[in-house]
Swiss-Prot record:
Protein name listed in UniProt: Small ribosomal subunit protein eS17
Gene Ontology molecular-function annotations: structural constituent of ribosome
GO biological process per UniProt: translation
Domain of life: Archaea
Organism: Methanospirillum hungatei JF-1 (strain ATCC 27890 / DSM 864 / NBRC 100397 / JF-1)
Lineage: Archaea, Methanobacteriati, Methanobacteriota, Stenosarchaea group, Methanomicrobia
Gene: rps17e
């Protein structure tokens, strides 16, 4: 889908650092986790953050 905006990456990385145990390699579960861990007002931003987190976990590119 292209390069993600900086604000999506920033939110995703912060969530992974502070709430890593909530996230898995399943997009639908990550959507719920993002909704519970943040107060993101729009569904589109929530889904983009969840997709970014899922992609990071599946590719193994997230490091503590």
């Amino acid at each position: 889908m292209g390069i993600k905006p900086t604000y999506i990456k920033k939110i995703g990385i912060e969530l992974l650092e502070f709430h890593e145990e909530k996230f898995t390699n399943d997009f639908d579960e990550n959507k719920k986790a993002v909704a519970s861990a943040t107060n993101v007002p729009s569904k589109r931003v929530r889904n983009r953050v969840a997709g970014y987190i899922t992609r990071k976990i599946n590719t193994g590119k997230f490091k503590k």
